[in-house]
């Protein structure tokens, strides 16, 4: 039975095809030299809006950075300077 399975073509699932396509897109973006994703400015504004619901802060008190540690690891860093309670 194993011999017959050897000659059959492997069936690809839609998940494996989607994963492969996503890996190609990510590799193309990395090779194109796109240092920061286009969504970071909007992400910063959204985070600022959420933080302002609880604390009164200025936009310059929030920084969002995306660091590429190695080929398959990225770190999203969020720094918020909160005012002191009085």
From Swiss-Prot:
One of its GO terms (biological process) is cell division. The keyword Ligase does not apply. Keywords: Cell cycle, Cell division. InterPro entries: MinE, MinE_sf. Coiled coil: none annotated. SUPFAM superfamilies: Cell division protein MinE topological specificity domain. Gene3D superfamilies: Cell division topological specificity factor MinE (3.30.1070.10). It comes from the Bacteria. Belongs to the MinE family. Prevents the cell division inhibition by proteins MinC and MinD at internal division sites while permitting inhibition at polar sites. This ensures cell division at the proper site by restricting the formation of a division septum at the midpoint of the long axis of the cell. This is Cell division topological specificity factor. The gene is minE.
